[in-house]
């Protein structure tokens, strides 16, 4: 595969990827495609990359991002190479998929501001444009055949990159819900549920109990 591509070609690829983003505001619950069948099928094709590292899986209505970032900061301060998968991004799509580690010539100290890359002595690396290009180009026909969503593709991209980068641990944030979320193909070493509130009621249920049931779907036996 040729690795050379222009910035314009890369941006066009991202535009096609963003077209797959569910338009909840415009379409409503009909844009939500729950289930992990596509993910399990592709995961098998790719050789189960997430089995190469330990995972902390996080779900909840509020606080997922803060908890994810604080955990990443704490783990990196112990000398671990930590993959971090969060959403949404602000400026760059690649912000969703990062690796945080401790600079070899310094001592890391956890940062309390929820930004692991700001921790003293830490190094943060975004997934490379080259990897994004190669991965999506390689699997484009499969994505189209399965009609995979934006979040499914992004999650697969993250899980594979983390394996290729040989991370020690991954902090994995759900996108929506938990039980049927694209991230729920993994078996973590720790499942974390943050605050539960009435959100996405047309997709997750109209009561706190129903929503909590969906979020708790990331909890695995003996974990």
What spans do the regions from the language model cover?
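Hydrophobic positions on the alpha1 helix immediately C-terminal to the Walker A/P-loop
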Residues: 66-70
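Internal gly/pro-rich beta-alpha loop/helix module
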Residues: 189-190, 203-218, 222-223
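Charged, amphipathic alpha-helical linker segments immediately N-terminal to NTP-binding catalytic cores
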Residues: 1-29
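ATP-binding Walker
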Residues: 62-64
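ATP-dependent carboxylate-amine ligase catalytic core
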Residues: 5-9, 27-36, 40-52, 77-111, ...
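Hydrophobic anchor at the beta1->P-loop junction of P-loop NTPases
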Residues: 56-60
